Amino acid sequence: MTHSSLPGYFGPLFAVFLFVLGLCVGSFLNVVIARVPLDQSIVRPRSRCPRCGHVLAWYENIPLLSWLALRARCRGCGVPISVRYPLVELLTGLLFFACLRRFGWTYELVPALVLVSLLVPLAFIDLDHWILPLSMTVPGMLAGIALAFPLGMDAFRDALMGAAVGFLSFRMMEYVGWKVFQREALGAGDKYLVAMLGAFLTWRALLGVLLFASMQGAVVGILMLLATGRAGPRTENTQDEPAGDAPPLTMTWEFTQPGLPLWKRLLLVPVCLLVQPIPDAPLDEEGEEEEWVPERTSIPFGPWLALAGLELLLLGPWLSRVLPADIAMMLGGLP
């Protein structure tokens, strides 16, 4: 049953309710975006102005309306309030409404809303801090698996496979990046985000997620280079003093032991790929990781993964119709 099939005026009424709920969730997601990267509580203290410390009253926290009523300025000190706060609220409300249009009043709406509530803050956190907090991606992955259980064992199995395939494929790319190029090929948190997407969208959608994210990220990256030129790193040029080499990835010392049975060597491969730590940056001469500074033209991959996940979640049936059948099949039939 979709919202349009509800009796009388209840269909539009519930649609408006879900949109307003999305606005309120978006207001909370602004708190998540601001506090989670700093390891601060998202419950206490109450929201306040970061400049003057003015604690916001309840009527200053009404999504969209408070920002407009305050004319985008703090009531305590008059400092401008970023337009991103109402934009996140509006974006979340619109995505909630889009999920309703896509799934109707069915159980599938529940995991869709949960996924939206995870992807929005993760995208903005990665834009701001270049991190994807494990405190969000790992519980999100588990939530995707758990929410698939009421849909039946096939859906539950697909969610498990999606999480496993997403994590292991990106873990392998991460390993190959260090083994072959001696540098980081992917962000450390990307594999957990892809595992979360696999749990919600199933493993069949992962190729589409990777393809859409890579293409859109590449287009924007090229446009940024054309607009700004090839900017160097934000720090001084250090080509004359190259960073220390990354440690050789020999997995574990057991591989070098003579007489080790072949079956043990094969068994150690997946185990070591899963548990061996891979540094996030090259090591200096003392063996400590150097501080990594993104170039001015660099953009994180997390937002593009989140965007691709939302596109497949909301536009899957439409993409299946407009794309050639062989491409749609290659992308797992799309969700």
From Swiss-Prot:
The chain crosses the membrane at residues 13-33, 105-125, 131-151, 206-226, 258-278, 299-319. Zinc is required for the N-terminal methylation of the mature pilin, but not for signal peptide cleavage. It is a multi-pass membrane protein. It catalyses: Typically cleaves a -Gly-|-Phe- bond to release an N-terminal, basic peptide of 5-8 residues from type IV prepilin, and then N-methylates the new N-terminal amino group, the methyl donor being S-adenosyl-L-methionine. It is found in: Cell inner membrane. Its EC number is 3.4.23.43, 2.1.1.-. Its main location: membrane. GO terms for cellular component: plasma membrane. One of its GO terms (molecular function) is metal ion binding. The keyword Zinc-finger does not apply. Zn(2+) binds at residues 49, 52, 74, 77. Its cofactor is Zn(2+). The keyword ATP-binding does not apply. InterPro entries: Peptidase_A24A_bac (IPR014032), Prepilin_IV_endopep_pep (IPR000045), Prepilin_pept_A24_N (IPR010627), Prepilin_peptidase/N-MTase (IPR050882). One of its GO terms (biological process) is methylation. It comes from the Bacteria. Keywords: Cell inner membrane, Cell membrane, Hydrolase, Membrane, Metal-binding, Methyltransferase, Multifunctional enzyme, Protease, S-adenosyl-L-methionine, Transferase, Transmembrane, Transmembrane helix, Zinc. Belongs to the peptidase A24 family. Plays an essential role in type IV pili and type II pseudopili formation by proteolytically removing the leader sequence from substrate proteins and subsequently monomethylating the alpha-amino group of the newly exposed N-terminal phenylalanine. This is Prepilin leader peptidase/N-methyltransferase. The lineage of its organism: Bacteria, Pseudomonadati, Myxococcota, Myxococcia, Myxococcales. The gene is pilD.
